[in-house]
Design a protein with these regions (language model features):
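Hydrophobic alpha-helical segments, chiefly the membrane-spanning helices
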Residues: 1-388
């Protein structure tokens, strides 16, 4: 990214995001029944959203958070999460609000929307963690082989990872310990949600076939308080200030800007991500109606869309060895805690529901993924300790 006209580029990202949401989705996709026109619009939305907006905003988040964490002493992953996770949270809240609006007139549709809200929120947690597991696994593989490995085999364009010994700036042991602790907290929060839904949230309604479970309001309030407490506790950075000589050209640009300007760019990047994700979620809803895909599947796919921004940031931190792998890991865990906080907000307004099968599968996968990531971080920590 060029060091000039950074603000202009971010405005362009927002313009594209708004164009996707209100022009392509609002004027074309939602107002046509022509299948080839709908297919073209869907392809265009995903191509521009992922290929341009997400990639561009991920770079901005990477550049701004490294400077901000030095100035504020907040963890880079904490700042990163607030740039990428709030759009996920807002999408879940919006789905829940729509669910509440139609609950008295169309209960089945209200429950389906609430299921989308839940599966979007927790589905994004699954993808975030599994993607981070893969990134750290590939880094550990590079460390074991003592050679550069591709992020994805056979795909050079996705970047590569160098052994830690070849990194000019390395993550600290303290960062790895902090990441493990944040992930442990996330695991406990996830288990709390699952257990609470099973013990206190069973819903029986003759209009709904099968078992249904709700994250009830009192549990939502407790969960919200716990999430805020965890975010506050782990807000501080465990990494030394970035070395000036290692700050890339774009970050040097931000290093010369006022803090208000950096916060503004970070916030605007989040807005661009929000509108792009909303466009993609609406696209998936239309696609679901066309193909008769179940709503819970649509919600889980929407969760993947919702976490693309975070995944791009983690990917960039992994293939660009500037000592920010620790920030990437903490950012993933913080991102998931923020989206869990979003689930708490949705529960407070009354809109988190899951069927028994999806409830079991989603939470088992999240807990398993958390365990795998903790294992990979432990291996990465051992590699750091063995570097001379």
């Amino acid at each position: 990214m060029q060091t000039k006209n950074q603000f202009s580029r971010i405005i362009i990202f927002i313009a594209f995001a708004l164009g996707l949401r209100f022009l392509i989705v609002g004027r074309v996709l939602e107002n046509t029944e022509v299948w080839w026109l709908q297919a073209t619009a869907i392809i265009l939305i995903f191509y521009i959203g992922i290929g341009y907006v997400f990639r561009g905003t991920a770079k901005v988040i990477e550049e701004t958070t490294d400077v901000l964490k030095n100035r504020t002493k907040l963890a880079g992953g904490f700042l990163q999460a607030f740039g990428t996770a709030f759009p996920d949270m807002v999408i879940g809240v919006v789905a829940a609000l729509i669910s509440l609006q139609v609950r008295n007139t169309d209960y089945v549709r209200a429950i389906n929307l609430a299921i989308i809200a839940a599966s979007t929120t927790f589905g994004s947690n699954i993808y975030n963690i599994l993607h981070a597991v893969w990134c750290i696994y590939r880094q550990n593989l590079a460390n074991i082989k003592h050679q550069t490995v591709l992020m994805f085999p056979f795909f050079k364009s996705a970047g590569s990872l160098k052994p830690l010994g070849e990194h000019n700036v390395k993550p600290s042991i303290k960062e790895m310990d902090g990441a493990i602790r944040v992930l442990t907290a996330l695991t406990l929060l996830t288990a709390f949600v699952a257990i609470s839904m099973v013990l206190f949230g069973q819903v029986k309604n003759e209009k709904i076939a099968g078992d249904l479970y709700q994250l009830i309001m009192p549990v939502g309030i407790v969960l919200f308080i716990l999430c805020v407490s965890v975010l506050y506790y782990f807000r501080k950075s465990h990494r030394p200030q970035s070395q000036v000589k290692e700050i890339i050209e774009e970050e040097r640009y931000y290093d010369q800007q006022g803090s208000w300007r950096i916060w503004l760019d970070l916030a605007l990047s989040g807005i661009a991500i929000l509108f792009t994700e909303e466009s993609m979620v609406k696209t998936m809803e239309i696609f679901s109606h066309l193909t008769h895909i179940p709503f819970v599947v649509t919600g889980i796919v929407a969760g993947l869309i919702g976490c693309f921004g975070e995944m791009m940031v983690v990917h960039n931190f992994s293939i660009n060895p500037k000592g920010r792998i620790g920030d990437a890991i903490v950012g993933v865990a913080m991102d998931n805690i923020v989206t869990t906080m979003g689930a708490a907000i949705v529960a407070i307004i009354g809109g988190i529901f899951l069927g028994s099968n999806s409830l079991i599968l989603i939470f088992i996968i999240i807990l398993t993924a958390n365990t795998l990531l903790i294992e990979q971080i432990s291996k990465l920590k051992n590699s750091l300790q063995n570097i001379k």
